[in-house]
Amino acid sequence: MPIFIDRRLNPKDKSLGNRQRFLRRAREELKRSIRDKVRAGGIAELDREHVVPIPRKGTGEPTFGDDKESGRRQHILPGNRTFSSGDLIPKPGGGGGYGSAAGTTESEDDFRFVLSREEVLDLFFEDLELPDLVKLNLKQVLSFKPRRAGFAASGAPTNINVGRTMRNSHGRRIALRRPKQAELDAIARQIAELEAKPASALVRERIAALREALDRLERRRKRIAYVDPVDIRFNRFDPQPLPNANAVMFCLMDVSGSMGEREKDLAKRFFVLLHLFLTRRYERTDIVFIRHTHLAKEVDEHTFFYHTESGGTVVSTALEEMHRIIEQRYPVAEWNIYAAQASDGDNFAGDSERCIELLDRKLMRLCQYFAYVEIIDERESHIFGATENGTSLWRAYNAVDGKWPNFQMRRIAAPADIYPVFRQLFARQPDLRKSA
Amino acid sequence: MVSQARKSELLFSGSDWNFAKLARVYDEIEALGLEKLGLDIYPVQMEVISSEQMLDAYSSVGMPLMYRHWSFGKRFLYDELLYRKGARGLAHELVINSSPCIVYLMEENTMALQALVIAHAALGHNHFFKNNHLFRQWTDAGGILSYLDFAKSYIARCEERHGLTAVEAILDSAHALMEQGVFRYRRPPKLSSEQQREGLRERLEYEERSFNDLLRTLPPSPGKSKPEATDEILAERKKSLKLPEENLLYFLEKNSLVLEPWQREIIRIVRIIAQYFYPQQQTQVMNEGCATFVHYTLMNTLFDRCRISEGAMLEILRNHSNAVFQPAYDDPRYSRINPYALGLDMMQDIQRISTAPTAEDRDWFPDIAGRGDWRDTLLDAWANHRDESFVRQYLSPTLIRKWRLFMLADSADEPHYEVASIHNERGYAKIRSALAQSYDVGASRPDIQVIDVDLLGDRRLRLQHTVKNGIMLEGASRDATLRHIRNLWGYEVSMVALDAETGAMLSERSTKEI
């Protein structure tokens, strides 16, 4: 007689921990795969669902294995019907071995992870954060919204909750046995009936007794009010702080003649990325598009990117326009203000100083973050890649860069640069602090 | 016989099973196995599990206890995926080489299948585990479960103390070297008891704390010049490190300069488990063949004695023939030679040669042909062979013809395969030898050894890959594996590939270039 053990009621999912460990690992691969895809396929790709296959061998477990493309082997196979010794069999396409027939490969399905748009974006933005967001929120709770929070025994008359009050009064009346009107009426009727009868000593006595009872009931009714102050309940409201989760992004773009299609395209991609990022992080995100030549104008998105217009370049006009709009519509107390400026760096002589002044005196105090992206020629990228030299605007902004930690500037030469630069600009910077 | 059969009644009827029926069937089958086949088995412990639990057990390399690692989770998800899609059925049974021998029965199985599983696993595999010399010498059936228990809790403790990531890094690296983590020629020591392990670990930690000669890195005194690396010193160094060493995990565990004691212990655990599975890899055909032969013989005997109904027998036969189905090489279902089919056919062939040999058989197998005692021949083969030697010894021309085996010579630089031998007079020996060769695990795995390391110099670990038949290592996975070795060794690791015949250097790769 063997030993039997019934294990069916044992806990299942013994491998749950293993699966969790695997998924955690797979996540890394997913992230990498998403990044590669977006880099290759363009930013529009980002806003879609994705199916990401992870090869079964994907989360790699390397070992020393034979290279199938080298060496001499012998295969023993069953089921020969036609061959005799010395026959030559051509290898199927491109020397991939004898397919499965050589007994070396097994066809293996991949795992497929279907990621929703949200998951894709989450993976994409996982470790990005707009600087200083938390601090501002903690510091300034600016608006409150009343929220119902039960009942109170005191309050303003407008807040009386009639239903609750009447229920209390009803209960109290029952508990204290307040005489009902019907009882009084009944006694009054009896008295009236007796009074109509010929008066006798007995009747008078009855009437006197009834009157006394009536009197007692009426006094009791007066004592026990229909609605007593203790019954009254008021609606109670709690002021609830509203998180200040509004962000406005200013897109400043130079559209002068020197900004060609390539430059605009790069700038656009950068703004799209920034916008996606902001919508992801904030409840409410506004975008203000400002384009400028020698004049700056607030425009809608389509005009911003596609309208053709040309002229000289005076960068400071855009900054002034931005300042004007902030004053008008975006009180600093309520809005997190971000700005991204894209330009090829050409500027009207002498205007760069004005830009410095504008940023230094006004804008940098208002902005949470100001990112300047200079779009340069691909041929220049290796020259200017790491130097401080450059256009007049670049040199001018360098001065601002040193002074304000919430100011960042980078150069972009090709679409592939955008994402890394974006990451650099918006990577978590724990020591970034708004000075003064 | 016939009169006895008439008298006897069915062991079970219907497809439902219960424990009473299982016990009755087991007792009957066990008695029959001992009587008819002369089997010798470990005590049996049968565990009834659900299909989910079977998936669990499957994914942790078939062991009931296993430490946690993501690769097992990956296996689980993959198996489950195939199972859900219906691309693959689950095994009906799982058997563990331990004493008592643990046999898993799935609750979904019908009674007929349970009977089949009992004959197959509880008797067939069990007998093989207990008697085959590889298992007897190389695995410790009594100690494995307690060792795994220890391994599991030890690694869990490490995860608590050092963090998941740190443990995972070591396990990943050790897993990559699992195939290079076995002693092929030297018998491993018996698994020690919990107490001994504790003592060993304490000693290890003590050694680690105290002075380690290998770590002496003081610069040489100014007056003395650095000793020249003469042949003598080289030889001395190799001798002190017992080089060359083919067991990479063992070498790293003992000699790595950067590993902490707990990391060494984890490597040791992986190494011991790799070693435990090494005999299984060498005896697939024999093990499955033995179990299949046993269940086929016993079930047929029971049927002949009218102890099981025709319906049950039909179900059993259907499962049996699924298991031993061998498609031809050009069949889309072909993936490899089915070890169940080859093992069973060879064993039945031995039976035939012993009882009804042809003239050819008498030529090829003078020792066993016509001796009639097929049972003793089989018991002897089960006990004393592994796949490679079993095929080399017993694959008969009859079987080669029946299977229509042929041999392809495949040279990577030729645009075609050449049919080197077919199932004819000239081909028998060659086919048999080549097939045997293909089952030699030691020969078919890359031969990689530690050949040298300069502990006083740059501490570069030097590996040598002996290239047989020009078969190189696949580049990407080789580089990744070398990186893993580097993680464990802590310093540069380089590997040269030398041709086995000419000794010419084919390639050299160092972790510096990766």
Curated annotation (Swiss-Prot), chain A:
Q: Residues annotated as region Disordered?
A: 54-103
Q: Is the Transmembrane keyword given for this protein?
A: no
Keyword annotations for this protein, in alphabetical order, are:
Plasmid
Domain of life of the native organism:
Bacteria
Asked if the record carries the keyword rRNA-binding, the reply is no
| One family name in Pfam for this protein | DUF444
Q: Which PANTHER family match?
A: UPF0229 PROTEIN YEAH
**Family per similarity comment:** Belongs to the UPF0229 family.
UniProt xrefs under NCBIfam families? PRK05325.1-2, PRK05325.1-3
Q: What is this protein called?
A: UPF0229 protein mll9637
Species whose genome carries this gene: Mesorhizobium japonicum (strain LMG 29417 / CECT 9101 / MAFF 303099) (Mesorhizobium loti (strain MAFF 303099))
